[in-house]
Every structure is written in C-alpha cells, then in structure tokens.
Regions:
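C-terminal assembly and membrane-engagement modules of membrane-active proteins
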Residues: 64, 68-71, 75-78, 82, ...
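Long, hydrophobic, amphipathic alpha-helical segments used as structural scaffolds
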Residues: 36-39, 90-97, 138, 142
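Long, low-complexity
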Residues: 1-70
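Intrinsic-disorder-associated interaction segments
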Residues: 14-24, 75-82, 95-98, 116, ...
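Polyanion-binding surfaces on beta-sheet-dominated domains and ring/shell assemblies
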Residues: 104-141, 158
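Membrane-inserting effector segments that mediate pore formation, membrane fusion
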Residues: 48-114, 126-127
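Aromatic-enriched hydrophobic runs in primary sequence
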Residues: 9-12, 86, 142, 152
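Proline-rich intrinsically disordered, low-complexity coils
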Residues: 39-41, 54, 97, 117, ...
C-alpha cells in the first residue's frame, strides 16, 4: 500500500543552525497537518502535540540544499488533493509579488488570499475558509491562533523558495518486510 508523501526542497540555503533547521521541520509538519485537516475542516486544526496527525519525517542535506520528506498517516485521495492544494498555494504565493509598502500579518494574508485557488472543489473551498478564518482571527487581534501561525508558515516556505511536491511512496513497513534480514 502506498502512503501520501509531501517532499519539500529548500535550495540556496547557507549553513543553517539547529534553530533554523527546527523551524523548517516545524514548517513541513504544519503543511502535513493542513493536508490532513483540509478534507474535514469542521474538525479542529492541530499542528503539534496531542491530537496532531502522525507523520514520519526524513531529512536529507546535500550541497546547498535541504530536502524533507513527510509521509502522512493517511492514504485517501482527499488528503492527497488537500496536500496538492497546499503545495499549489505555496507555489502561487512564491510567484506573487510582495508590495513594498505592505507589511504585517494583514498584508501577508492578502498575499495568500490573492494566490489562493478560486475553484469550486471541496478542498479549494476549505483553503479559502482557512484563510478567511485566519483573517478573522487577525481582525479580532488574535494573532497567535493556529490558523494564523499556519498561514504565516506557508508564507515563510514560499519566501524561502521551497518547492513542495506531493507524491505516493511505498509504505515503509512493507518495504522493510520485503528485504531479507541481515545478521550484524
């Protein structure tokens, strides 16, 4: 059976410290949490801790870049479409020019809103509702909610030039079982 995986490639990274590496891993975990949550937006969005969707994360650093692969604990097509919508949003925001005079969380949410998909699918509507919820939180002066932090994470990934890809990979336990055991 195949798992849904989100591959995030960051290029042109200078040597990064542990804190920056932890931030990148947190960003990728947020993308995974959004992908797991978008098919059921009536549920509570949980990014970390108890109640968060379990994931498996692999990190590879090569040359000037870092690649992270996060495998979701979901195999359904809805989660795959949600992950693709998030990847598309990050790519679109990266292409969206940043206004010189616009600063702050509201301006960031405006960038996300302009780049958000305008389709009629359930996932695209859920993305727009997520962004509208983040905007509502900001207007109510609640800037530390999960929605606002998740939206800012998507912007950070886009600003860092992250390439987000969604793919299917072989289930890790199944792959391990297929290999013969080797004595050590």
């Amino acid at each position: 059976m195949q798992e849904i995986a989100i591959r995030v490639r960051l290029t042109e990274q200078e040597r990064i410290g542990l804190a920056e590496h932890e931030r990148v891993i947190g960003s990728v975990a947020t993308v995974a949490a959004l992908a797991a949550w978008l098919p059921d937006p009536a549920a509570r969005l949980v990014v970390r801790g108890r109640g968060a969707a379990p994931v498996r994360l692999e990190t590879v650093s090569h040359g000037p870049g870092t690649e992270l692969l996060v495998a979701l604990d979901r195999r359904d097509a809805a989660a795959e479409r949600a992950a693709a919508a998030v990847a598309s949003l990050v790519a679109a925001v990266a292409q969206e020019p940043r206004a010189e005079d616009a600063t702050g969380i509201t301006a960031d949410l405006d960038r996300l809103d302009r780049a958000a998909p305008r389709g009629r699918s359930a996932v695209e509507r859920a993305v727009r509702e997520f962004l509208e919820g983040a905007r509502t939180d900001v207007l109510a002066r609640r800037t530390t909610t999960t929605r606002v932090r998740a939206a800012q994470t998507l912007l950070r990934l886009a600003d860092d030039g992250a390439e987000v890809l969604v793919e299917r990979i072989e289930d890790a336990p199944a792959a391990d079982a297929a290999e013969p055991t080797r004595p050590y």
